[in-house]
């Protein structure tokens, strides 16, 4: 049986409490496609690598999508009303700010695909740690990987330069495009 359409403003009014850290998302549909409503703020330093594309739409406010594009670290600002299609296998860190809401659409993962969570050294940009898993429940699996990294200084120590990687961004280290 088909479900009813979602009235997004009404849904947010009634359910915004469901958008909780560290991922701040709620899965609205989870069949051939996963549709998530995502709120801010969040505070993560990991880069997610999904083998399939991800579609981002910013319903309220702007977000920053930190990416590694052909080996270069850069920030993509997705403003209110804008959408962006991220190609598969692109390391990305979605940064969401207070009072922002977006929609993310992902394909259901084929059985042979592996998602990865990668942390880079803020000093030398080497990979500090990588966790991998077949994604069946994005919210719980990403949260578990983030919590494991947060709680283990050995995982967070760069083997190249010895710097302890941050598990969350330092206050003030990310410019909020909503206040410029």
From Swiss-Prot:
Keywords linked to the UniProt accession: Cytoplasm, Dioxygenase, Iron, Metal-binding, Oxidoreductase, Pyridine nucleotide biosynthesis
Cofactor list: Fe(2+)
Domain of life of the organism encoding this protein: Eukaryota
Residues given in the record as a divalent metal cation binding sites: 121, 124, 158, 161
Cystine pairs: none
UniProt binding sites for substrate: 54, 96, 106
One Gene Ontology cellular component: cytoplasm
A Pfam family assignment: 3-HAO
Residues annotated for O2 binding in this entry: 44
Reaction catalysed by this enzyme: 3-hydroxyanthranilate + O2 = (2Z,4Z)-2-amino-3-carboxymuconate 6-semialdehyde
Subcellular location: Cytoplasm
EC number: 1.13.11.6
Enzyme class: oxidoreductase
Pathway: Cofactor biosynthesis; NAD(+) biosynthesis; quinolinate from L-kynurenine: step 3/3
InterPro entries from the UniProt entry: 3hydroanth_dOase (IPR010329), RmlC-like_jellyroll (IPR014710), RmlC_Cupin_sf (IPR011051)
Gene Ontology MF terms in the entry: 3-hydroxyanthranilate 3,4-dioxygenase activity; ferrous iron binding
Chain residues that bind Fe cation: 48, 54, 92
GO BP annotations listed: 'de novo' NAD biosynthetic process from L-tryptophan; anthranilate metabolic process; L-tryptophan catabolic process; quinolinate biosynthetic process; quinolinate metabolic process
Membrane-spanning ranges: none
Alphabetical list of NCBIfam families matching this protein: anthran_nbaC
UniProt record similarity statement: Belongs to the 3-HAO family.
Main function: Catalyzes the oxidative ring opening of 3-hydroxyanthranilate to 2-amino-3-carboxymuconate semialdehyde, which spontaneously cyclizes to quinolinate.
Annotated protein name in UniProt: 3-hydroxyanthranilate 3,4-dioxygenase
Taxonomic classification: Eukaryota, Fungi, Dikarya, Ascomycota, Pezizomycotina
Gene: bna1
């Amino acid at each position: 049986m088909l479900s009813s359409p979602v009235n997004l403003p009404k849904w947010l009014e009634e359910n915004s409490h469901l958008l909780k850290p560290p991922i701040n998302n709620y899965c609205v549909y989870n069949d051939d496609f996963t549709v998530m409503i995502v709120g801010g703020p969040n505070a993560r330093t990991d880069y997610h690598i999904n083998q399939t594309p991800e579609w981002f739409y910013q319903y309220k406010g702007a977000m920053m999508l930190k990416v590694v594009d052909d080996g270069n670290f850069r920030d993509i600002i997705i403003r209110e009303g804008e959408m962006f299609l991220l190609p598969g296998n692109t390391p990305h860190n979605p940064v969401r700010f207070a009072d922002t809401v977006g929609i993310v659409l992902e394909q259901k993962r084929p059985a042979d695909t592996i998602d990865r969570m990668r942390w880079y050294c803020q000093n030398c940009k080497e990979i500090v740690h990588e966790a991998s898993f077949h994604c069946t429940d994005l919210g719980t699996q990403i949260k578990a990987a983030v919590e494991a990294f947060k709680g283990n200084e050995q995982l967070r120590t760069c083997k190249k330069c010895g710097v302890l990687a941050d598990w969350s961004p330092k206050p003030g280290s990310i410019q909020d495009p909503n206040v410029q």
